[in-house]
């Protein structure tokens, strides 16, 4: 293994960690900076191209469960996590990635596969896989394409909509990378 490959691998690990840490802290601006300017994020909810679209999507995820306005007559049933968000607070959330496999294909292209767990103050919420592609941009390896695949989520939890808006207890998907 060449030194540049080791540097690429560590930069990619750092990129994945920054995505999680910034997202967990509600720093969406910094979270989105781990994507290339024309980066792509795919989830069960859709495909988002470019930092602006990814930012809008991430902001909508953070807003999930908030009532339209304080004077809304529409009754909104929220989970405890969504109630925290409705009060303008970032709840306790933590992303954990594990079993990350990185394939550095060239000096300009790499792929990674990771399992993730998403925890809230109530415990395990949902879990799945990230399938990522990376490229160096201005000397930093950034995500050019992230495909988030939710394998399972608990009904009523934050991630219940992560599989395209469905409230699910378990999703059946192939476990291969």
Where are these regions (language model features)?
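Hydrophobic/aromatic beta-strand elements that line small-molecule binding cavities or substrate pockets
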Residues: 97-102, 118, 129-135
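Short, surface-exposed beta-strand-loop junctions and turns on beta-sheet-rich folds
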Residues: 49, 118-119, 149-150
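Acidic/histidine-enriched, glycine/proline-rich intrinsically disordered or flexible terminal extensions
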Residues: 154-177
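Short, low-complexity N-terminal intrinsically disordered segments enriched in polar/charged residues
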Residues: 1-29, 33-37, 49
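A structural preference for long, well-packed, hydrophobic secondary-structure segments
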Residues: 9-10, 18-22, 112-117, 127-128
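A solvent-exposed, acidic/Ser-Thr-rich amphipathic alpha-helical stretch
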Residues: 28-114
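Solvent-exposed loop/turn segments connecting transmembrane beta-strands
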Residues: 122-124
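Short beta-strand edge/turn micro-motifs at domain boundaries
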Residues: 111-113, 127-160
